[in-house]
Amino acid sequence: MLEVNILDKKWCSIIENPKNFVLGVINASLKELKIDHYKPNISIALADDDLLHQLNLKFREMDKPTNVLSFPYEQLSNECDLGDIAISIDTIKRESHEYYIPILAHIAHMLVHGLLHLLGYDHQKKDEEIIMKNLEREILASLGYNMCAI
């Protein structure tokens, strides 16, 4: 089951129906990765910089907000609790403006990025980063978005 929690009303001023948008991106990503049959449980928090700052400080010891954080729980299996994704509308808006990225494309990118982290992908090493970026590019292309470089 996919659960979307809108924790900041700014999301509704950017996207007409944020829950449907998020569900569409996540479901299409799972399908593109050919793992949609597992039906994992994922919770997505559509939040703001305040929450992402708190989470980033608590879990990563980084005293600043960030665009997306992922909290994996279980490895992928049938109806597993895959984990949580939190995404900040404030950082997304700022980055979209700063890097001239369409905001919906950037939101989709960060959702895909967060999902890949839940699935165990990382970008700490160059070879891992290449694999993760290629997957992001493929998934975003399947959604009709070009990969935006940040």
Swiss-Prot record:
Q: Does the keyword Nuclease apply?
A: yes
List the signal peptide residues.
Answer: none
Q: Which Pfam families match?
A: YbeY (PF02130)
Output this protein's name: Endoribonuclease YbeY
- Record's PROSITE patterns? UPF0054
Instruction: Indicate the family of this protein.
Output: Belongs to the endoribonuclease YbeY family.
Q: Name one GO cellular component term.
A: cytoplasm
Q: Name the coenzymes or cofactors required.
A: Zn(2+)
* Electron transport keyword on record: no
The subcellular location is:
Cytoplasm
Q: Which domain of life is it from?
A: Bacteria
Q: Any idea which positions bind Zn(2+)?
A: H113, H117, H123
Its Enzyme Commission number(s) read 3.1.-.-
Keywords annotated in UniProt: Cytoplasm, Endonuclease, Hydrolase, Metal-binding, Nuclease, Ribosome biogenesis, rRNA processing, Zinc
Species this chain originates from: Wolbachia sp. subsp. Drosophila simulans (strain wRi)
Q: What does this protein do?
A: Single strand-specific metallo-endoribonuclease involved in late-stage 70S ribosome quality control and in maturation of the 3' terminus of the 16S rRNA.
Return the cofactor note field: Binds 1 zinc ion.
Q: Please state the gene responsible for encoding this protein.
A: ybeY
GO MF terms listed in the record are: metalloendopeptidase activity; RNA endonuclease activity; zinc ion binding
**What processes does the entry annotate via GO biological process terms?**
rRNA processing
